[in-house]
C-alpha cells in the first residue's frame, strides 16, 4: 500500500522502499532479501520541537554551559554540523538549534525526506521547505535556494557527494548552515565529508575550506542507560574547527565525554571568539571552563585537603590556595566532597581544564565552590 500510494514498485526487482507520510519515515526490505520476512523500520518525525531545555539539562542530555554556549554560537551565525549514528537524534538536535535562530531570519530546509517540519512548527516565520527528488537534485534546489536569499540553510543529512557540495557551496557563499552527518566522532566530520566525494578533489584544499567555514561539530551518542533504564541520548563531543594564521586546518575539542564518564572542557580559540565578535556577539574567552570548574579532592591522595590530581601527577595546592597554576586537568570523582562541597552533578570522574586565571576572589588557584554561585564577573 505504501508503494502504491507513492507510485513506486516493491518486489523482487525493486526490493528496497523508502516511504514517508506526514510524520512518519518508513523503510522496507523485500522478503527476497530479508529471508525471515519483510523488514520494516518506522520512525516518527513529529512537527514539534521535542527537546526542551529544562528536561535535557535534568536528564544529562547536555551540560548547561555547553547548551548556552551552543545557543550563543547560533546567535552568532556559526555553521554547525551534528554527527552521530542512525537514531541518535541528530535531526531533533538541529531542529532545537534552529528554533533559537532569530525570528526575522529566513530559513530554507532542503531534504530528500521531509522530517524537519520547521515551516509547520513556526508558521509565522519565513521558512521554506524544499524537497529533492529524481527531477530536482540537491544542486538544482540549491541554485533556487540561493535566489530566495535565506540567512539559514538546513540540510537534514549529508550522505552523498551532491549533499557535501551543497554544504560547501552554501557556506562558501556566505549562507549559514545547520546539518547532520553519519560520523563516529565530531572531529571526523571534515574527513567524513571528503570521503563522500566522488571526484578527486585536493584533500588539503577541501579540508581547509571546511575548517574555515564550519565553526563547530557536535557529536550525539545514543545508548541504553542503566541509570534511566531506557535508551539515552547525550551530546558527547563539541569540536571547534578553524584555520590558523599560517593557513593550517586545525580543530580543538571544547567538550568531550568518554564512555567511562570522564568529561573534558576547554575554552574556544581566539578564532571562534573573533568570528562571533564580527557577528556582533561578545563571548568571554573563558566562557566554558570558567562556569564549569569545580575542585574536589581525589580519593587516592592525602586527607589534608591540599592535594588534587592534575593529569597523571599530584599537584600540591600550596599556602591554602595561593600559588601558581600548573596546566592540566583536575579529576573529580563521583560523590566526592571537599570542605562540604559535593559533586553537584553526581557525575563520575569529571575532568576539567585547570588554566583558569583570576575568577575566584582574584586568586589564581580555584577553590571549591558551588557552580550555581559562579557568575560571569
Feature-to-residue mapping (PLM):
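P-loop NTP-binding catalytic core
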Residues: 1-76
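Switch/coupling sub-region of P-loop NTPases
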Residues: 77-80, 96-209
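Conserved lysine of the Walker
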Residues: 90
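Hydrophobic positions on the alpha1 helix immediately C-terminal to the Walker A/P-loop
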Residues: 93
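Helical/strand "switch-coupling" subdomains that flank nucleotide/phosphate-binding cores, especially
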Residues: 209-237
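NTP-binding/hydrolysis catalytic cores, primarily Walker-type P-loop NTPases
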Residues: 230-377
Amino acid at each position: 500500500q505504501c508503494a502504491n500510494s507513492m507510485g513506486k514498485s516493491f518486489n523482487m526487482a525493486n526490493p528496497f522502499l523508502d516511504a514517508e507520510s506526514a510524520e512518519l519515515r518508513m523503510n522496507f526490505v523485500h522478503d527476497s532479501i530479508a529471508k525471515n520476512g519483510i523488514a520494516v523500520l518506522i520512525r516518527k518525525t513529529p512537527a514539534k520541537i521535542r527537546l526542551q531545555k529544562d528536561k535535557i539539562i535534568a536528564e544529562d542530555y547536555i551540560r548547561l554551559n555547553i547548551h548556552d554556549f551552543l545557543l550563543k554560537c547560533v546567535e552568532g551565525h556559526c555553521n554547525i554540523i551534528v554527527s552521530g549514528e542512525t537514531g541518535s537524534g541528530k535531526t531533533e538536535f538541529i531542529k532545537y538549534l534552529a528554533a533559537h535562530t532569530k525570528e526575522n531570519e529566513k530559513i530554507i530546509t532542503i531534504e530528500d525526506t521531509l522530517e524537519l517540519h520547521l515551516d509547520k512548527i513556526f508558521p509565522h516565520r519565513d521558512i521554506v521547505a524544499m524537497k529533492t527528488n529524481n527531477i530536482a537534485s540537491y544542486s538544482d534546489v540549491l541554485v533556487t535556494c540561493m535566489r530566495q536569499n535565506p540567512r539559514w540553510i538546513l540540510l537534514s543529512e549529508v550522505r552523498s557527494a551532491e549533499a557535501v557540495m551543497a554544504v560547501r557551496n552554501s557556506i562558501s557563499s556566505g549562507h549559514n548552515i545547520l546539518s547532520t552527518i553519519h560520523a563516529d566522532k565530531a572531529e571526523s566530520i571534515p574527513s567524513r565529508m571528503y570521503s563522500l566525494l566522488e571526484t578527486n578533489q585536493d584533500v588539503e584544499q577541501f579540508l581547509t575550506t571546511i575548517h574555515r567555514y564550519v565553526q563547530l561539530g557536535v557529536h550525539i551518542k545514543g545508548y541504553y542507560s542503566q541509570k534511566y533504564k531506557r535508551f539515552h541520548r547525550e551530546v558527547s563531543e563539541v569540536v571547534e574547527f578553524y584555520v590558523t594564521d599560517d593557513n593550517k586546518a586545525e580543530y580543538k575539542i571544547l567538550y568531550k565525554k568518554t564512555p567511562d564518564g570522564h568529561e573534558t572542557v576547554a575554552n574556544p580559540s581566539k578564532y571562534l571568539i573573533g568570528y562571533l565578535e564580527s557577528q556582533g556577539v561578545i563571548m568571554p574567552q573563558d566562557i566554558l571552563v570558567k562556569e564549569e570548574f569545580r575542585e574536589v579532592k581525589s580519593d587516592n591522595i592525602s586527607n589534608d585537603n591540599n592535594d588534587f590530581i592534575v593529569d597523571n601527577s599530584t599537584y600540591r595546592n600550596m599556602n591554602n590556595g595561593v600559588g601558581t597554576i600548573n596546566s592540566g586537568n583536575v579529576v573529580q570523582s563521583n560523590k566526592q566532597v571537599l570542605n562540604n562541597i559535593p559533586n553537584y552533578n553526581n557525575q563520575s570522574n569529571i575532568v576539567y581544564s585547570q588554566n583558569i586565571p583570576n575568577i575566584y576572589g582574584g586568586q589564581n588557584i580555584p577553590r571549591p565552590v558551588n557552580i550555581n554561585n559562579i557568575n560571569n564577573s
